[in-house]
Amino acid sequence: MKILNLGSLNIDKVYAVGHFAAAGETIKAERLDLFPGGKGLNQSIAAARAGAEVYHAGAVGRDGGGLSELLRGSGVNVGLLRQLDGESGHAVIQVTPSGQNCIIVFPGTNGMITHGYIDSVLKNFAKGDVLLLQNEISCVDYAMEKGSEMGMRVVVNPSPVTDALLNCPLGLADCFILNETEGMALAGTGSSANADILRALAKRFPAADIVLTVGKDGALYSGRDGTFLSHGIYDTDVKDTTAAGDTFCGYYIACTAAGESPREALEKASAASSIAVSRKGASPSIPEMREVMSFLERNDG
């Protein structure tokens, strides 16, 4: 089973700060690091490092050669990637000493995806393959519709949540992987209680599996068959949470695509995410499957 990630590619500019800058405030950064990033890139790398056959489709500018090389070096097929005139997407990220982050994203070439390009990409895939989508590229709604028409398994990581995303045909999704903030926005519930968010999402999207990541409380799962699962987090020294969600997402998708149960996928995705937050950077923090298995042997054995 192939995984097609039609997703973003960014250059991350990460500033180490004592606290997030407030409105009207100027603060000094202690350090600047440049990393390849974007939810799309991170999730493709995570899925590939989990052992999946991953194809990344999307666009970079003339400054994005390093992004495609990183994907290729991580085992991701980049034959469908396009280089366009203009700047690649980039993100400005503030990271505090506790590892929390605040992110501003400029779409760049991520916003230049067209219907014609999506059609040319999808002809390389078939019914049963996985289509992974975030909300950092243009024409997400069209990709959902076409992927669903083909019988692909449409997995949506609805980030960031925007009015345009909420107007997408989200009912076509076969699986959602999202955090509490995204869950509240999609569910339309005023409650911040995890159980209420999960219940509201399951009611609104009865044909989809729901995976809700809930920070220090781990992750919750509600299957379309009525199955409910939960998995806690592992105790690690948190250094940077930037790629935590993307690592979880990529690992979960890879494991389920390989035929593993949701319970097994939650376990490995949670372990991979725990390893990622103990390291600096986004894509550099994503572990290989052998590291995840070794981690689980130490923590679950």
Predicted regions and their residues:
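Ribokinase/PfkB-type carbohydrate-kinase core domain
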Residues: 1-9, 69-83, 93-229
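Conserved phosphate-binding/catalytic region of the ribokinase-like
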Residues: 3, 163, 194-301
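Substrate-binding N-lobe of the ribokinase-like
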Residues: 3, 23-90, 290, 294-300
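Positively charged, low-complexity intrinsically disordered leader regions
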Residues: 1-23
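Short, conserved phosphate/pyrophosphate- and ester-handling motifs at nucleotide-, phospho-/glycolipid
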Residues: 47, 179, 245
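Gly/Ala-rich phosphate-binding loop of Rossmann-like dinucleotide-binding domains
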Residues: 48, 148, 257
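Short glycine/proline- and charge-enriched loop/turn segments
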Residues: 21-29, 177-179, 229-232
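Residues at secondary-structure transition points
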Residues: 27, 31-38, 42, 86-87, ...
